[in-house]
């Protein structure tokens, strides 16, 4: 009995050590991107990428791609970027909008001169689970906004555990389109978390930026028609207009009968009908319609913008390359390649029990500044709808952009490097920026202008680091200097000191991860040695008393002369694990390689990412034309 208890305690200790080793395998070093296929010559932007588990019971993991800032201006900042959909990958933002690189073709990256990582760490997250490189069991897609926000906070908790050097940064959450629902909900959950007395480390949420956001559905649904009239897409006296106005009345009635919703089916059909009835057969014999993301452009019906932007033809094949997937630490058992927008996620995420995010904005504005920006040529989440809900909303003691009763904050004309860029308007913690001649994806059209906007909103001060400031003016008045396009200097002692602190924190995190694994390995080795010693001693004792031989139910371990159970254990998996062809248990590795340990979990081979949405794409990875409602979404 005592022998059995000793064996049980021994294997329990070994199992505990193995379990700890598995959990410790995810360290900052595991996420480090050592090289990126197609990257331009010169130093690679420091980056990390991979999955973080947010719902173990549903096998839900969020994928992130993090880029370290180029320069530190007066304080550390982190910008988190989310695309919309719902179900559209934030790698759109990484490779077509605000990330450090753009694709010249499907295998060549070039620098993005307007990248948002100039003065801020920049992280893209495929959100919610099932989107892009993120994954979850196919029957467990997120359906409500609070559930999404809960998972995102879990993601941030684990991210900051892995990278504690970023946990006290000023945090900004940015994105576009349907992220106008995600971002306010995430912000609310962060603010609630910070108010919890049990929270040890508060996160410094400093601002939200939402571009062409789907925030106030009621105003946006009505704006489909108002925007079309203003742009000459629709004749107010036409039969088409009468049909659409009747549809909108049905939409308004459903809204009134059922209360505010994020998504109303009868209202969604207004845009689809508008695109269909305004389409025409043109000289090439094909039916063409307006591009709903940029009304200056045309597209074949029923795509109506889903073939845009042009960079998309390079992004999809690039993110499906085996070497790129490996470089970004995407799970190799992924059942499908990267998809820009996962239809199954969008179909599940109806948020029928969630209030539209506009209901959250007034309370958030009491604590956090918000910047809303719009591209003037976007139809699907157009600026008329955004301006309408701002005008109706009451926050911080006033309605709309009132500065005094009856007096509104002026729209200040914005010029960028001598060109008309749009206007700015702000009051009581809310800023609104209209980008002239821009589409649904503002940073795609104007990356440098968009970063100028970001830097001003964050209060970037380049006086300590130098650099060439851009000429950006409001009503002719030159604004505080920020650099756009030119590299900032890095010459002051203050800058070097801040960088040194950051590096020290980072390497401390890496060392800590390595030390934990070494301790676990040492404990396991001692426990195993003790067990072997006790087993040999006991076996010798049995032979001396009985003259017998070891039991047939056990096997001899070659080279040790000891016995182990013939039933495989967790230790067996650890013992056979090899790194670069070398035996990990034998110690044939250096300390830095501990960061590269990865253990396959039981779930590795059984998850699927949007497997039921693969029918949206053809063999080349391009989206099939399934009508306006079956494509990118918002």
UniProtKB/Swiss-Prot annotation:
Per UniProt, the enzyme's principal EC class comes to hydrolase
Major location category of this protein: Golgi
Could you list which ranges are Cytoplasmic topological domains? 534-634
* Originating organism: Pyricularia oryzae (strain 70-15 / ATCC MYA-4617 / FGSC 8958) (Rice blast fungus)
Membrane topology per record: Single-pass type I membrane protein
A single Gene Ontology MF term assigned here is: serine-type carboxypeptidase activity
* InterPro entries from the UniProt entry: AB_hydrolase_fold, Peptidase_S10
Descriptive protein name? Pheromone-processing carboxypeptidase KEX1
Which residues are exposed on the Lumenal face of the membrane? 25-512
């Amino acid at each position: 009995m005592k022998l059995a208890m000793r064996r049980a305690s021994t294997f329990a200790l070994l199992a505990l050590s193995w379990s700890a080793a598995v959990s410790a395998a995810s360290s900052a070093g595991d996420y480090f991107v050592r090289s990126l296929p197609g990257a331009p010559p010169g130093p690679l932007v420091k980056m990390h990428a991979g999955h973080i588990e947010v719902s173990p019971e549903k096998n839900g993991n969020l994928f992130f791609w993090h880029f370290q800032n180029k320069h530190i201006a007066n304080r550390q900042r982190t910008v988190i970027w989310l695309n919309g959909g719902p179900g559209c990958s934030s790698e759109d933002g990484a490779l077509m909008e605000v990330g450090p690189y753009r694709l010249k073709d499907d295998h060549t990256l070039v620098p993005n001169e307007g990248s948002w990582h100039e003065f801020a760490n920049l992280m893209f997250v495929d959100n919610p689970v099932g989107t892009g490189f993120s994954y979850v069991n196919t029957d467990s897609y997120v359906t409500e906004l609070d559930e999404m926000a809960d998972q995102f906070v879990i993601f941030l908790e684990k991210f900051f555990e892995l990278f504690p050097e970023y946990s006290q940064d000023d945090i900004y959450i940015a994105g576009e389109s349907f992220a106008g629902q995600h971002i306010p909900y995430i912000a609310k959950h962060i603010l609630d978390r910070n108010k919890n007395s049990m929270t040890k480390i508060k996160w410094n949420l400093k601002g939200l930026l939402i571009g062409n956001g789907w925030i106030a559905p009621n105003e946006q649904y009505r704006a489909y028609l108002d925007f079309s009239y203003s742009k000459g897409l629709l004749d107010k006296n036409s039969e088409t207009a009468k049909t659409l106005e009747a549809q909108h009345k049905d939409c308004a009635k459903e809204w009134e009968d059922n209360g505010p919703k994020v998504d109303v089916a009868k209202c969604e059909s207004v845009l689809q009908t508008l695109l269909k009835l305004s389409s025409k057969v043109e000289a090439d014999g094909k039916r063409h319609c307006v591009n709903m993301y940029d009304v200056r452009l045309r597209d074949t019906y029923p795509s109506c913008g889903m073939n845009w932007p042009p960079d998309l033809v390079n992004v999809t094949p690039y993110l499906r390359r085996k070497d790129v997937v490996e470089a970004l630490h995407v799970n190799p058992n992924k059942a499908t390649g990267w998809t820009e927008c996962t239809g199954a996620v969008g179909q599940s995420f109806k948020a029928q029990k969630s209030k539209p995010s506009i209901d959250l904005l007034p309370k958030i504005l009491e604590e956090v500044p918000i910047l809303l920006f719009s591209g003037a040529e976007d139809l699907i989440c157009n600026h008329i709808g955004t301006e309408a809900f701002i005008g109706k909303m009451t926050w911080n003691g006033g309605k709309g952009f009132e500065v005094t009763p009856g007096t509104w904050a002026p729209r200040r004309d914005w010029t960028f490097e001598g060109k008309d860029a749009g206007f700015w308007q702000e009051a009581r913690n809310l800023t609104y920026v209209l980008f002239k001649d821009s589409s649904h994806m503002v940073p795609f059209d104007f990356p440098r202008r968009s970063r100028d906007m970001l830097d001003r909103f964050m209060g970037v001060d380049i006086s300590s680091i130098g650099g060439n400031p851009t000429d950006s003016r409001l009503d002719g008045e030159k604004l505080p200097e920020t650099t756009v396009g030119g590299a900032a200097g890095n010459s002051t002692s203050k800058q070097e000191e801040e960088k040194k602190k950051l590096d020290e924190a980072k390497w401390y995190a890496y060392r800590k991860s390595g030390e934990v694994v070494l301790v676990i390995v040492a404990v396991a080795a001692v426990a195993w040695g003790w067990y072997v010693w006790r087993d040999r001693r006991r076996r010798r004792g049995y032979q001396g008393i009985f003259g017998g031989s070891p039991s047939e139910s056990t096997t001899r371990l070659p080279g040790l002369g000891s016995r182990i159970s013939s039933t495989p254990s967790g230790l067996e998996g650890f013992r056979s694990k090899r790194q670069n062809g070398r035996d990990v248990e034998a110690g044939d590795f250096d300390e830095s390689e501990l960061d590269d340990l990865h253990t396959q979990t039981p779930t590795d081979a059984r998850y699927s990412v949007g497997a039921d949405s693969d029918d949206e794409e053809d063999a080349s990875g391009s989206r099939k034309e399934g009508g306006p409602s079956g494509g990118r979404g918002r």
